[in-house]
Amino acid sequence: MSCYVGLDIGGTKLLVASAEQDGAIIRRVRQDTPVDLQEGISLLHQMIAEVAAGRPIAGIGAAIGGPMDWQTGIVSPLHQPLWNDVPLRQLMQHRWNCPFTVDVDTNVAALGEYFCGGHDVPRLLYLTISTGMGGGFVVDGRIYRGAGGGHPEVAHQSVHSPFPRCQNVPCPCGSRNCLEALVSGNGIKALYHKPAEALTAAEWAEVEHNLAEGLRNLAAILLPDLIVLGGGIACARGQQLIDSLNHTLQERVRIVACPEIRLSKLGYDTALTGAIEISKRGLE
């Protein structure tokens, strides 16, 4: 009997899992991501063979950092500088002789939440808040894409903050006061000179205020039924963060319906779960 395989290709770790048709995971393995491209591709092949354990593979899905072209499967993840213009789909299909589907990790994670997170809504916005920040918007089971099939950069909206240290903050993208620069792990370290877990209650109040302002913008523009938060920062802060954001958004969102905010139930497996889903469903 055949199986499906999901790949979560990160800048520091590789996660690979095989699954049944219903998504139940059979085997999973984890390895550090090699810096060298050929070593990385070779290791992925070894991991796929390990989790498949001799069973035919019906499809492979992958989540990887951008930029990339999801239609051609050519990837150039920023956090893996030696992976430049890699024809990942071609390499995988040639080796495994099965359909291969790949997309930006936040899109894949959003699909994982949509199909496997227990949310019964047509429009779901998923945001990951970890070292960086990103998101994916799913409408009726399909990823929303911008002009030219582009990936909307929800974390690079400019946010007005009333706090002196959170004003005129440079972002690596070249702009200032981007949401990512105010609430991501890297942003928090730059602003507060400490990791998120060491913030005081007053400092967390600033972060939550800034995040709520960004979510208010997204609620007004995209009108999602639900916003799901994942990633290391959000998961570590947990329900305390969710309760604070829901309370604040109820006060700030006007004119449009206020979406509920939930914490991801998939934890750190959102992208891997989504990769398994697109190995079965594709992206069309």
Functional labels for PLM-detected ranges:
Residues 14, 64, 132-133:
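Short loop/turn microsegments at loop-to-beta-strand junctions
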Residues 122-179:
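Glycine-rich phosphate-binding loop of actin/hexokinase-like ATP-binding domains
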Residues 32-35, 83, 151-153:
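A short acidic/small-residue loop/turn micro-motif
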Residues 73-84:
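A charged helix-plus-loop insertion that forms the helical arch/lid used to bind
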Residues 58, 64, 139-140:
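A cytosolic small-molecule/anion-sensing beta-strand core signal
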Residues 102-106:
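Short loop/edge segments at beta-strand edges and connector loops
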Residues 1-59, 69-72, 90-100, 112-121, ...:
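ATP-binding/phosphotransfer module of carbohydrate and carboxylate kinases, centering on a glycine-rich
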Residues 28-30, 78, 146:
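Residue-level detector of high-confidence beta-strand sites
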